[in-house]
Amino acid sequence: MYSEWRSLHLVIQNDQGHTSVLHSYPESVGREVANAVVRPLGQVLGTPSVAGSENLLKTDKEVKWTMEVICYGLTLPLDGETVKYCVDVYTDWIMALVLPKDSIPLPVIKEPNQYVQTILKHLQNLFVPRQEQGSSQIRLCLQVLRAIQKLARESSLMARETWEVLLLFLLQINDILLAPPTVQGGIAENLAEKLIGVLFEVWLLACTRCFPTPPYWKTAKEMVANWRHHPAVVEQWSKVICALTSRLLRFTYGPSFPAFKVPDEDASLIPPEMDNECVAQTWFRFLHMLSNPVDLSNPAIISSTPKFQEQFLNVSGMPQELNQYPCLKHLPQIFFRAMRGISCLVDAFLGISRPRSDSAPPTPVNRLSMPQSAAVSTTPPHNRRHRAVTVNKATMKTSTVSTAHASKVQHQTSSTSPLSSPNQTSSEPRPLPAPRRPKVNSILNLFGSWLFDAAFVHCKLHNGINRDSSMTAITTQASMEFRRKGSQMSTDTMVSNPMFDASEFPDNYEAGRAEACGTLCRIFCSKKTGEEILPAYLSRFYMLLIQGLQINDYVCHPVLASVILNSPPLFCCDLKGIDVVVPYFISALETILPDRELSKFKSYVNPTELRRSSINILLSLLPLPHHFGTVKSEVVLEGKFSNDDSSSYDKPITFLSLKLRLVNILIGALQTETDPNNTQMILGAMLNIVQDSALLEAIGCQMEMGGGENNLKSHSRTNSGISSASGGSTEPTTPDSERPAQALLRDYALNTDSAAGLLIRSIHLVTQRLNSQWRQDMSISLAALELLSGLAKVKVMVDSGDRKRAISSVCTYIVYQCSRPAPLHSRDLHSMIVAAFQCLCVWLTEHPDMLDEKDCLKEVLEIVELGISGSKSKNNEQEVKYKGDKEPNPASMRVKDAAEATLTCIMQLLGAFPSPSGPASPCSLVNETTLIKYSRLPTINKHSFRYFVLDNSVILAMLEQPLGNEQNDFFPSVTVLVRGMSGRLAWAQQLCLLPRGAKANQKLFVPEPRPVPKNDVGFKYSVKHRPFPEEVDKIPFVKADLSIPDLHEIVTEELEERHEKLRSGMAQQIAYEIHLEQQSEEELQKRSFPDPVTDCKPPPPAQEFQTARLFLSHFGFLSLEALKEPANSRLPPHLIALDSTIPGFFDDIGYLDLLPCRPFDTVFIFYMKPGQKTNQEILKNVESSRTVQPHFLEFLLSLGWSVDVGRHPGWTGHVSTSWSINCCDDGEGSQQEVISSEDIGASIFNGQKKVLYYADALTEIAFVVPSPVESLTDSLESNISDQDSDSNMDLMPGILKQPSLTLELFPNHTDNLNSSQRLSPSSRMRKLPQGRPVPPLGPETRVSVVWVERYDDIENFPLSELMTEISTGVETTANSSTSLRSTTLEKEVPVIFIHPLNTGLFRIKIQGATGKFNMVIPLVDGMIVSRRALGFLVRQTVINICRRKRLESDSYSPPHVRRKQKITDIVNKYRNKQLEPEFYTSLFQEVGLKNCSS
């Protein structure tokens, strides 16, 4: 920088301004003169001044003569008061430039600059070290330094010449004391910090008021290079350069750039009046004032200064051993501190908060949105350094490292760790670099030379490598000798000789080297999307990584730890050629993650942080084998570092062959991990690799079935990945016992890298630990249960025993948690039990055949019983305790509700989902309105239904009139709408009295045919029958017979008349009867046979039925016991009737139908292009498929299927259009055709016409892509016929024509929701359909998924503005228990950022998803995901986020509980309180007749 300028070194050497005339006289003369002259002056200063008293020195001549004496007096020994008086006089006189006093001679006051310049030169004599009275000299020196500080700070009269003399004075006194080797306890050691502090402070003041010329800067740089063996020099330099950097960043990048905060004490070093240009110039010059800080790693360079050379030769002229200088033992720590200072500067330019060990941590303030701009270079172009190195870098000789060397005692303790990562706390995510940070090339142009040189300090490279001088260590012959002697010393020598410790050996420069490596890693990890880095920098960086990650020959633990700590996002930055170092990182991870103790790293770093960073790197490596397949990675140097020419590492390896190594690392990490955060990250990675493997194999199978061949897709089973390269890596790298990973590998040796093998390994590992190590940890348990739920959805065929193992482990976990002592029961514990029941439901719905096994069914039902009642009926060998004998005592109502939901799932959903009506609704798509509309009887209305309630939990709506469908009209039928806790179900029931065949083949109620009678009855004989036999007439009469007279004997005339009348009447009657008999016989002969009048026939069948009464009676609901009020209970009877005529009844029934049967979630998807910051810019991106990447549309299709909002019976993303079964018209099909012909992009899924939808048996999700309000309407009206051949357009017809999975039960003829379909979600929120009740739907979590083309734009995502666009209407419902407040913090809104990489993989950033139970899986911050698994993992993460939010909510009630509460409310409001006779009477009455007009 100052090569064309001459140093002032010769000027300083030739300057005799510090000598006096008295130096020409004998010492005794000078001492006596000085004592005599100085004493009166000093005594006058010590006494109070009297007004009017005259100064002893009046003329210029007197003053100058006295100053000659004082100059000599400053060289005297400190045994008397002379030197003190001299110092007092001079420190008083130099204040003439600040505030003149009476004690100052008048000539000095008149010409202060001239005299002060002379005084400063004289004061140099005070700082010459003396052999005795060191404390007195230190005190006097401090007095002078304080006076100098005051002079520089407060003087406004100093001329440039005085400033220059002052700077030279400070340089000279620093050089006098600091240039020689440090003597322990000497004056230099005590004054070093103050000396260098005053020098830098005064220099900064001079820059403000009188900027030093280049010769002064060059002189300062040369002199400071001679003082670097003092720790204080580097410390003070670091403070000054950090303070300057803080000011520089403030005006260079503006207030939006993260402020680099430094302690107030350091910031005060920079004068407030220093302008920006001065700050920039001063900063760059101060940066280079320390020369090359890498020199600090070479004792030979540090000891080659003139002052060292003076002591390097002893009296006899023989060279002294270099390691005899005790001050050199501080070089490793000084080197580290210099690297730490540079590291802080780099972090400041990157905008990363990184705590410093020496002062308050610099923390960034709010990062406001600023436009992206090019980095401002503070280096003048003509001064920018292009050199590779500033000192000689001879090739280092290869030498073996002794045992004592390898087992050296570490000089750092864990309490003062030399390494630190930007993420110091486990709960806070790593800070992102500032969006407006400089480019990587700019930072490397400024700091790269130093950092790369420091990163290769004392590295030993293989002889076969073509070494560049810029890549090797700094060496000289003397330093080689130093290292040779140090490395050959035995351990006994190090321990017995207190003059040596571990920090005297070159390997202890590892701390500084590690700091440089970590800084470079952070620089390259801060690469912006699309940024180009010079190949020279990339090659050196990869060389650094390969060197730092070596584990075969020599492991440098600090460097290895630093690289790992600072490289988590390294494989997420699209660095060109980064895959070259993948094998080396894998080898490093094999050293770190399976090691439980990490004892070799504990003295350097926090093991938990090291493991976390290793896991982050592992997360970014896992998709590579599947993604690149058989692509070969060139292994550059691994074999050469091992000195084994036959090593298999020299051979190129395929990425697929690394899969087994990565899986084993993952398994080993899970077995040894104890930190909850790290464990959850591993669990998320397990689901990622299992699902990716399953999808890849499924694609491979499809291609094989289709006849296609693809080497990159079908290799999973043919190439197991066990190659010579991967096989060698499984050997233990530590002398400990065999790692668990190898033991597990033996258990699953066959197909261990297949999807089925991975799934089995994952289930075994997770279930084993869930009921052992993890069951006490809530966060890990929850993540493990989420992993098991995800594994249940992986479509891979595994043995039923493995699936049963998962179900059994969840049951065992529930039993353990429920059986814990009462004092340990808490809401969090019950949340875990609820989560376990939810996991159990997932497994049962995904694998319903598991309940075909008796043992599994018994275990599951016992767990349900335990959750509902609090105990099992049978425990071990105890007697069975029946339900009626048990007193219900569940762990909590939440647990009971979860168990009831599980029971409902078992009884109603298993094997019945999805129903023929589709997955959009587990309920029947039928209600009263639908039945009325399609009934054939016009008299049917809503009052034609009878409403009953069973057991206070099920509402029955019975329609007795037939519907006119396929039901047989001859049999009694009833249509029942069953509204229970699980939803609304419609049953059409018919009383079946005959088998199905009899209905078709037999005539009902027709008797069997009879034979025709014969009219020929044979001959008829007329025989007169006598009442008595003939013998009666022959019997003679006796006297008694004659005692009764005959009739004529006693009849008188009057009686005769009457007798005759009677006789004639009888004759007439007989004739009439004979006539009738004849007539009857004639008619009888005319009739057919059989006589229909007299023939016996069966009664005709009933035509009108009261089927509701029959239904209730047949099911036993009409017993007297069912109608009685239960004793000692407030519950209603088992059967009650509801009065549907009470106003508001049907509104409440509709309200009940709107209560969802499953949890519902909403995801809003945004697309963010580079540089965008406003919500309108982001919303407009989805208006055309040409403005988004093709993978984005593919991603949308992987989330769910397209549904029409007007026809969809499930959740649509807004309450105004959800769960409706009567809201579509026939005109929508024509509109669909218009939409299909236009390029409206993903905005079709904005919730106006369509949304993306996903549902399973337990949850439903709506994926909404918000767009501007007018986008869809404009596209329909414009009729633009632009048919450009764009690749993205090919995807849209598939999206729009995708068949809906919902079943259209009936064609709908109701009016469409025109008002809501042309409004954005935020506008629809304020326009709900009139008359439609909206129930309080409880807690709602709105998850946002953001596709960002440029990763740095995450900082600019306007989440607060877009909150208005992600309304679902739930937050506006009345009495909503968790309606979103206007004060909702942005950090509480879960956001999943997806950034596509150039490799075709995707980088994940999670924001706001960390809740009470820590992070959510499977997606983890920093994870890399493949195209295949992206949709599944995002969807699963959304489900888990929302489930966790519901678990954390104090007011959340499951859907079945809310429905049960509403049913109870309906019963209480509309119960028909009738007496038993009245109830029975009402059953025989017709319903609906009096309300036909309504």
UniProtKB/Swiss-Prot annotation:
InterPro entries: RALGAPB, Rap/Ran-GAP_sf, Rap/Ran_GAP_dom, RGPA/RALGAPB_N
Tissue spec. comment: Highly expressed in brain, mostly in amygdala.
Residue stretches making up the Rap-GAP domain: 1149-1392
Keyword Phosphoprotein: yes
Keywords tagged on the record: GTPase activation, Phosphoprotein
Gene3D superfamilies named among the record's database cross-references: Rap/Ran-GAP
Keyword Chloroplast: no
GO terms, biological process: activation of GTPase activity; Ral protein signal transduction; regulation of small GTPase mediated signal transduction
Molecular function GO terms recorded: GTPase activator activity; protein heterodimerization activity
Subunit structure: Component of the heterodimeric RalGAP1 complex with RALGAPA1 and of the heterodimeric RalGAP2 complex with RALGAPA2. Heterodimerization is required for activity.
Task performed by this protein: Non-catalytic subunit of the heterodimeric RalGAP1 and RalGAP2 complexes which act as GTPase activators for the Ras-like small GTPases RALA and RALB.
This protein's name: Ral GTPase-activating protein subunit beta
Naturally occurring in which organism (per UniProt): Homo sapiens
Gene symbol of the encoding locus: RALGAPB
